[in-house]
Amino acid sequence: MTKRAMMIAALACTTLIAGCSGGSEGKGDDAGKAGSESADATSGMPASWKATDACSIITSAEMAEVMKAEVSEATVGLVNEANGPNAATSECTYIFKDGGRASVMTRWSPIGDNDDAAIGGAKSTVAATVKAFTDRPVEDVSGLGKAAFFVPKINQLNVYLDDVRMVMVTISSAPDATAKDQAIALARKAM
């Protein structure tokens, strides 16, 4: 496993774990209705934003359009169904015909725990972790959901769309010069 791949895996896990640490008891009453009029009857997750199928949130066609590269394979994995206060998650891994890779991780929380404290904690944790690999700081990105930040060098964009939804776009094979703009364009498709 390359150093870059290990860094991406470490940051993805760190961000998801840190994002789960917010305390939001009592916020779940209407949280599952954000973004959709109909919701999954068992979990409350919006039917139009199924976090357990990240490949449906950003499709292969949308990925190909933004990346200007044909997607040869898209695979969903790391699926976790919502259960009580535990979030629903998944990851879609896209492989391009040219050998490039990208991934999209999605998260929906039944308790609306994407509060300022959880987001700040996740960002601080990522910033501390990334210092081991680069001297470039984590960058805030405005105009995307409730909060967003970009991790240079590994080309990862973390977007907290609202109190219940989060998307993490990682474009490890994209050139550093275009990766941030491409990740932002992909995140907009998840909104």
Predicted regions and their residues:
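Extracytoplasmic low-complexity, Pro/Thr/Ser/Ala/Gly-rich segments
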Residues: 31-90, 94-96
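Short stretches within intrinsically disordered, low-complexity N-terminal or propeptide regions
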Residues: 11-14, 36, 150
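Sec-dependent bacterial lipoprotein signal peptides
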Residues: 1-18
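Bacterial lipoprotein signal-peptidase II cleavage site
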Residues: 19-37
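Short, solvent-exposed recognition patches
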Residues: 70-144
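A short, solvent-exposed beta-edge/loop patch
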Residues: 40-51, 55-56, 64-65, 134-191
